[in-house]
Each structure stands twice: as structure tokens, then as C-alpha cells.
From Swiss-Prot:
Family named by the database record: Belongs to the amidase family. GatA subfamily.
Keyword ATP-binding: yes
Any one Gene Ontology molecular-function term assigned to this protein's record: ATP binding
One cellular component (GO) term of this entry: glutamyl-tRNA(Gln) amidotransferase complex
Keywords from the UniProt entry: ATP-binding, Ligase, Nucleotide-binding, Protein biosynthesis
The protein's name in its UniProt record: Glutamyl-tRNA(Gln) amidotransferase subunit A
InterPro entries: Amidase, Amidase_CS, Amidase_dom, AS_sf, GatA
Signal peptide: none
EC class: ligase
EC numbers on record: 6.3.5.7
Role played: Allows the formation of correctly charged Gln-tRNA(Gln) through the transamidation of misacylated Glu-tRNA(Gln) in organisms which lack glutaminyl-tRNA synthetase. The reaction takes place in the presence of glutamine and ATP through an activated gamma-phospho-Glu-tRNA(Gln).
Active site: K76, S154, S178
Gene behind the chain: gatA
Record GO biological process: translation
Length: 491
């Protein structure tokens, strides 16, 4: 096994035993990144920074070293990294190098992590296939019949990099499923924490009431380790919760006897593929065999979640993206003689924003306009409150976690949805958006392969602030599924 193929936990132990140096581990990842160019997962590599951090980690080894000392990670391009290009995969931020560090990356560096570079993503995190990036498509390391497949979105580069062993783990963000869907498509683990568990400061905003950062890893244990380093109160983020961060790794006891797992009847969608239904049934059996009690529950407002999400998220995006005007930073259009400031705004945004971002900004502006605010935006906010109430009632009735599919299918081909109705692409989020609307933690765990040999995942949804319990349930599911498959290397 090459060093870049290790999990965080395995690498941590090997580093502690002196069997491996952080420099060797980092070099193995940098070599893998060079070989992995066809995946287009990394869009900016930082070998000098990485090796400096690795040497510092080797010097620190021993007492007082952080939980991630010497562990090489990839960072989604949505996170601001001081002095390193941070473009949110958008032409409008081309060349932007922040003069500050996001809270998440600061915490990772404090824990001793090594930054290998920045990862591809959908532009401004708007997409489910990583096809809206100014850097071009990220490619799933899993392949069928020589077709290039999507790694999912928006954290597609993060998912592809982890699945292909280009890095030991990566950061992602999740607004409506952007950690969990790519994780399911690539056979890795991805957790969206409770809203407010991880600081959003220094992360380019999409929809501020929905965005949440989280880890994308090779195992549930790694997710627990990485989340422990990312989480915590941040006075710079007013939505960051001032509550203690438990030891997530210590919570992985593997004992879920007597725990109650809810199965929401509303997630049995019309036309659900038989493979997804069978996978869900298998997940129920695995948790029951581990001693959990399986109960049917109702989340009656689930059917309204997708339309509510695609009103609220674009509305918030249209407000957040108004700051990109060509005045202070990023791209500015070339102006003709006689052009005024309005012309500059219009030309800059037309050149800088891609089609999907423009579409969502227009939707958001429309639903916030005077004649439609009550009909669309206010109604969507009321639906959101009802969706949250459904979950609150299920948890109040004693349910400890909820099991659902993570995605309605396995990964599809790049370009296959290009001419489809945008709503068809939005349906990829059908199982995940409720979690963001309710502010809950959710995790995708790889459980099996479909008939084509592509990975499929199941989603577990937890009580608010109970990532520890959620991770333990996921740990049990992971062990029972025994998913160890890796993509056959073609790149």
C-alpha cells in the first residue's frame, strides 16, 4: 500500500510509531496528484506550502502535536486561504488571493494539517455534477464503459480526490447535499454537521442559512477525527454555536443496541429504482441486526422540500452574489467609451458568472421581488418551518436517527444532463435538502455497488448537535456493509 492510500487514522498511527514521516506522506500525495491530472480534482496545488508544513509537522512530532499533525488534506476552492487562489470556481473571482484565512483552514493548520492545494467544485457551490466550474469538469475516478462520470456536486473535486487517494481527506461544504451526494457517488464518507457546528467565516457564501462545512473522508472514523478539528465556536461567525465539541472519535463504540432508527415513509418516491429500494432495505436489516429498533415514521411535508429549497437558496444567493460587481476584487469587464457604472456591473456579471449561477440569481431576484415575495419566498419559509417541525416531532417521539437513501441513482455521465430541464438536475437533491432546511446533521455512508459496479450510499440523519451519536450509527452501518471497493485506476 502506498502512503497516500492510508486513512487519517492509519497515517496518524504510522507517524506516531515513526514508520512514516509527514514529508514522505506529503510527497506520496503530491506524486498521486500529478498522476491524477485527468481527474481535474485539484485546480491549484501548493507543494511548497505543503512541504514546509510537513517539515514543521515532523519537527513537532510527539507530545503536544495536534490531532492532524502531518496529515495531508485537500481544501475546497470555496474556503479562503491566505495568499492562495480562492476563486469559488468562478471567472468573476479569477486571480483572487485572500489576505486572510478561513476559520476552518486556520483550525486545521493549528491541528497540524498539511494543505496540498485547492479542489474543484461547482461555481459558487451551485450544481450537482461539478459541470458549472470555470476550471472544467471534475471527473469521477469510478468508470463504466469508458464513460466519464460525474463525481457529484458541488464538492465534486473533494470527492474525486479522496476516492482516488490523491489526499487523505478533504473539506467540503453542503447547502442542499453538496457533501453527501458526491460522497455517495464516489464511495466515500461525507458528513454535513448541524448548522452552526462549524464556522462559516471565510467560506464564500451561497445561501447563508443553509451552508455548512464538513469533512469528506475514507472512513467514518476519519470523519470523526476531521470534524473534531473543524468544529467549534467562532466569535467571527454570528451563526456559530457556543457549545462544547465532544470527542467524536471516542463516541465510535459500535454499540447501538436499543437505539431507535426511523424509516420515513415519504422517502419512498414514485419511480425509485429497485436497486435503491433494495439498498435501503439492506441498511434497515444491518442496523436491526446490530440491535437497533426499526420504526416507521412520517415526515409529511417532505414533498414540499425541493421546491421550498429552490426558492430559499436562490433568494439568499441573489443577495450574497450582489457583492461581486467588479469594483473591489476579482474580474472587471473591459468598458467601452461612454459606459457608466451600471454598464460595468452588467458586463462584469455577464462575463464573470456562468449560466447556472445567472439562472439562480434571476430566480432569487424574481422570488424576492415586490409582487412575488409573499407568494414564493414567504410561503417557502413557512414550509421550511413545517419541515423542521416534522423532524422535531420524530425525535421527540424517541427516534435517535433516521435512515434514507443518499441519492436517487448512482453517478451519471458527464454531459448527460446538459440538455435536460434544470429541474431534472435539481432532483438529485431530493433526499438531502430536508436536512439543510431543518439544520440537522446528516452523513452519507458507502454501502454497496449497483449492477454497473458503481458505488451507492445510504444517509443517516441525526438529532441536532448529536453528531457523536450519528457518527456511531454510521460506524455500525459501515462495519456491517464492509464496503472496501476502490475504483480501478485508469488515470
Amino acid at each position: 500500500m502506498n502512503a497516500n492510500e492510508l486513512t487519517i487514522a492509519e497515517a496518524r498511527d504510522a507517524l506516531a510509531r515513526g514508520e512514516l514521516s509527514a514529508v514522505d506522506l506529503t510527497m506520496a500525495c503530491l506524486t498521486a496528484i500529478d498522476a491524477g491530472t485527468p481527474l481535474n480534482a485539484f485546480v491549484h496545488t501548493t507543494p511548497e506550502i505543503a512541504l514546509d508544513q510537513a517539515r514543521a509537522a515532523d519537527a513537532r512530532r510527539g507530545a503536544g502535536a495536534g490531532a492532524l499533525n502531518g496529515i495531508p488534506l485537500g481544501i475546497k476552492d470555496l474556503f479562503c486561504t491566505r495568499g492562495v487562489a480562492s476563486q469559488a470556481a468562478s471567472n468573476i473571482l479569477r486571480g483572487f488571493k485572500p489576505e486572510y484565512e478561513s476559520t476552518v483552514t486556520s483550525k486545521l493548520f493549528e491541528a497540524g494539517a498539511v494543505m496540498l492545494g485547492k479542489l474543484n467544485m461547482d461555481e459558487f457551490a451551485m450544481g450537482s455534477s461539478n459541470e458549472t466550474s470555470c476550471y472544467g469538469d471534475a471527473v469521477n475516478p469510478w468508470k463504466v464503459d469508458d464513460r466519464r462520470l460525474t463525481p457529484g456536486g458541488s464538492s465534486g473535486g473533494s470527492a474525486a480526490a479522496v476516492a482516488a487517494d490523491l489526499c487523505l481527506a478533504a473539506t467540503g461544504t453542503d447547502t442542499g447535499g453538496s457533501i453527501r451526494q458526491p460522497a455517495a457517488f464516489t464511495g466515500i464518507v461525507g458528513i454535513k454537521p448541524t448548522y452552526g457546528r462549524v464556522s462559516r467565516w471565510g467560506i464564500v457564501a451561497f445561501a447563508s442559512s443553509l451552508d455548512q462545512a464538513g469533512p469528506m473522508t475514507k472512513s467514518v472514523r476519519d470523519a470523526a477525527i476531521l470534524l473534531g478539528a473543524m468544529a467549534g465556536h467562532d466569535p467571527k461567525d454570528s451563526t456559530s454555536a457556543d457549545i462544547p465539541v465532544p470527542d467524536f472519535e471516542a463516541a465510535l463504540t459500535g454499540d447501538i443496541r436499543g437505539r431507535k432508527i426511523g424509516i420515513p415513509r415519504e422517502y419512498r418516491m414514485e419511480g425509485m429504482p429497485a436497486e435503491i429500494e433494495a439498498l435501503w432495505a439492506r441498511g434497515r436489516e444491518m442496523l436491526a441486526d446490530a440491535g437497533a429498533e426499526i420504526v416507521d415514521i412520517s415526515l409529511p411535508h417532505t414533498k414540499y422540500a425541493l421546491p421550498a429549497y429552490y426558492v430559499i437558496a436562490p433568494a439568499e444567493a441573489s443577495s450574497n452574489l450582489a457583492r461581486y460587481d467588479g469594483v473591489r476584487y476579482g474580474h472587471r469587464a473591459r468598458l467601452g467609451q461612454g459606459d457608466g457604472i451600471v454598464d460595468m456591473y452588467e458586463k462584469t456579471r455577464a462575463e464573470g458568472f456562468g449560466k447556472e449561477v445567472q439562472r439562480r440569481v434571476m430566480i432569487g431576484t424574481y422570488v424576492l421581488s415586490a409582487g412575488f415575495y409573499d407568494a414564493y419566498y414567504n410561503r417557502a419559509r413557512k414550509v421550511r418551518a413545517l419541515i423542521k417541525r416534522d423532524f422535531d416531532e420524530a425525535f421527540a417521539a424517541g427516534v435517535d436517527a433516521i435512515l434514507t437513501p443518499a441519492t436517487p441513482s448512482s453517478a451519471f455521465g458527464l454531459g448527460e444532463m446538459a440538455d435536460a430541464d434544470p429541474v431534472a438536475m435539481y432532483l438529485n437533491d431530493v433526499f438531502t435538502v430536508t436536512v439543510n432546511l431543518a439544520g440537522l446533521p446528516g452523513i452519507s455512508v458507502p454501502v454497496g455497488l449497483d449492477a454497473k459496479g458503481l458505488p451507492l450510499g445510504l444517509q443517516l440523519i441525526g438529532r441536532p448537535w448529536d453528531e457523536a451519536g450519528l457518527l456511531n450509527h454510521a460506524h455500525v452501518l459501515e462495519r456491517a456493509a464492509g464496503f472496501v471497493e476502490k475504483p480501478r485506476k485508469w488515470w
